[in-house]
């Protein structure tokens, strides 16, 4: 919704670059929504989204995602109408719409009935607190690279052990921070200790 002057943004008080989204058009928009629910602002100043936050948001009956633009939104609107500010990462986007799409997709896939195979969620990266290891499909050979023999063996225990090893290895190499608070089985702890003694990161 626009002001009577037909605009939704104006220059910042005190000077500075860019334009600021005005509070009045935004407040009128929010107040026109019959069931606004929990109000989220996509903002570089917000809490970084992770899987735990997505699970928490998925429990809300209604969400309204407010997407910032330009230099940002008048702070008075944020103070009056926003329940939570969130960010999808430490980088700059043209607006909050792309971040909102990320939130919508992440929440949608954990709603029962959305995914064809609900069991696939259980082994997702960040659901297990570990990154997934390499995955393969046909053909068996591509650019002189073969599918690991263990995956063709049919031995489920060996395949499970291989996947655990690869998952821990990849997490240790690429996202070691995820291992800080992860709960591992005795078996996984032993594998991780072995990896740490062998790998030069």
Regions found by a protein language model. Give the residues of each.
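S-adenosyl-L-methionine/SAH cofactor-binding core of RNA-modifying enzymes
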Residues: 20-69, 75, 112
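Structured adenosyl-cofactor binding patch, chiefly the S-adenosyl-L-methionine
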Residues: 77-124
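A short acidic, often aromatic-flanked loop/helix-cap motif at beta-alpha or helix-coil junctions
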Residues: 1-4, 47, 92-95
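Internal, active-site/partner-interface "lid" segment
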Residues: 98, 110-150
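Conserved RecA-like P-loop NTPase ATPase core
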Residues: 16, 68, 155
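A short aromatic-anchored loop/beta-hairpin motif
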Residues: 2-5, 9-26
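SAM-dependent methyltransferases
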Residues: 139-201
